[in-house]
Design a protein with these regions (language model features):
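N-terminal leader segment of winged-helix/HTH proteins
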Residues: 1-31
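Pre-recognition alpha-helix immediately N-terminal to the DNA-recognition helix
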Residues: 12, 19, 39-43, 104
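Canonical helix-turn-helix DNA-binding module
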Residues: 50-100
Length: 105
């Protein structure tokens, strides 16, 4: 059983998630994006170590399948929001970078 303090903290946490969801919907609509496209761009620009991400990292952050994330990346490429580059360090990996248009979105 949760304590009162834990329940209050959980309630506040869920409230902040709901506020972020509302903000995300408004931000994605303002940019002409789907919410998932917006979140993917956010995860690329917000990567803690660099300004690009792999499809696997994006799938993990989005809590989506790698296959579904690859399809999302391809749709965003068609919209000129992102570009894929083969990794110089490891040719098996593909880096997903924001384009200028993706940065503006």
């Amino acid at each position: 059983m949760l304590t009162r303090k834990q329940l209050v903290a959980l309630s506040e946490f869920r409230y902040q998630i709901a506020r972020f969801q509302r903000f995300s919907v408004a931000a994605s609509r303002a940019g002409g994006l789907t919410q998932t496209q917006y979140l993917m761009l956010l995860h690329i620009v917000g990567h803690p170590e660099r300004d690009w991400a792999t499809v696997g990292e994006l799938a993990h952050r989005l809590q989506a399948s790698p296959h579904g994330t690859a399809a999302l990346v391809n749709r965003c490429i068609a919209l000129r929001l992102v570009a894929k580059h083969r990794s110089i360090d490891d040719g098996r990996h593909v880096e997903v970078h924001l384009t200028e248009r993706g940065r503006r979105a």
